[in-house]
């Protein structure tokens, strides 16, 4: 019998950053040129991250579920989709592609509240939109209920706008 000894040699290619750092350690390096190379590398990383963000956002939009109008506005007798319908339609896709949503109150007065929604991606890219909404003082709501009603309404509309969502019956242009 012949005994065969196997060895595995793996070629490890240096990353761009490792090559730049090794060059920086050379005593005859042109620091201005090195800075320009680092700037170019940073620009390329940002471009790739933006591409990944747009690619994942496009995939998320294809993963949306239908939004059903599940409630009736007692004042206008019209149907609408509640906030939970919007969230249910997008949450699985957002989780799959590691997106996160954030809301924050940017400004509040006795009459209005400004809300911002941000969609964040692991690449560091974000998109945001905001709106100013009148505090809903209709009916017999106390001030906390009025604000809560307005925030729910604002979150639904901003989520729809940011993620290009529409309930089935709202989408009248196909």
PLM feature spans:
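Polyanion-binding surfaces on beta-sheet-dominated domains and ring/shell assemblies
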Residues: 1-174
């Amino acid at each position: 019998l012949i005994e065969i000894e196997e060895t595995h040699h793996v070629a490890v290619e240096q990353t761009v950053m490792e090559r730049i750092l090794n060059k920086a350690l050379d005593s005859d390096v042109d620091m201005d040129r090195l800075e320009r190379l680092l700037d170019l590398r940073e620009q390329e990383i940002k471009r790739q991250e933006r591409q990944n963000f747009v690619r994942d956002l496009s995939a998320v939009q294809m993963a949306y579920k239908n939004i059903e109008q599940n409630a009736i506005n007692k004042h206008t007798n019209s149907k609408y989709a509640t906030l939970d319908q919007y969230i249910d339609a997008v949450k699985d896709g957002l989780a799959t592609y590691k997106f996160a949503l954030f809301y924050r109150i940017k400004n509040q007065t006795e009459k209005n509240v400004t809300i911002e929604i941000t969609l964040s991606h692991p690449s560091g890219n974000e998109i945001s939109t905001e709106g100013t909404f009148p505090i809903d003082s209709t009916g017999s709501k106390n001030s906390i209920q009025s604000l809560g009603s307005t925030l729910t309404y604002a979150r639904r509309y901003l989520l729809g706008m940011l993620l290009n969502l529409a309930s089935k019956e709202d989408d009248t242009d196909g």
